[in-house]
Amino acid sequence: MKKIITLFSAAIVLLSATPSCEIREGGGDSPKNAVDLGLSVKWATCNLGASSPEQSGDFYAWGETTPKTKFTWENYKWTKEEKSSYGDVILLRSKYNSSSNQGTVDNKTKLDPEDDAARAKLGGKWRMPTRAEFQELIDKCTWTLTSQSGVDGFEVKSKVNENSIFLPLTGFYSQTDGYDGSTLHHKDQGNLWVSDMDNTYTVTCYFKKGKPGSWFGTSREYGMAIRPVSD
């Protein structure tokens, strides 16, 4: 009996040591799921919508707060349709735009809080990271290609205090390269949204084998994963 109890206790210890992502929607700040890497913000253990670090979580278009499984210009929240003088349908931008040729001009380059998926889903101090905060993660951490529970990704280990997070290779959704917007592709790489734009392009932190942490300018209607941060 003593041996059985010992084994059971060991199992409990093992399970409690396994990282989890129980950040509940609207649950506010959850310190046990915010990893202190000694940086300006704390990073979530998992992607938004994931229940373990190796899961991709949900996919979002930039500026949308509801996940989906098909990503096109036609179903993007901030697209508006107008007709040309020839009667053709033109897809224009209704928000986050600086070009009069592409729609309503507001010159916004950073997501409003109500358009931040992490803030909308989690509440509290959770939000999407800025490009500067991701750059800090790149500069002040060591990125090592590894696998966790059979999923490839990067261990991102702080040079400040040696704490770490795992970023899985997620792939993304788009209508490029012959895809229809509903097929997850480029699963050999990770792409995570940031909350601010680079001129007319939205930006993701991009990482794959041989490229541990760099930048990729992309189109806002693409479906990407999100790793929340907490102030």
Range-by-range predicted roles:
Residues 1-4:
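Positively charged n-region of N-terminal signal peptides that target proteins for export
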Residues 8-16:
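Bacterial N-terminal signal peptides
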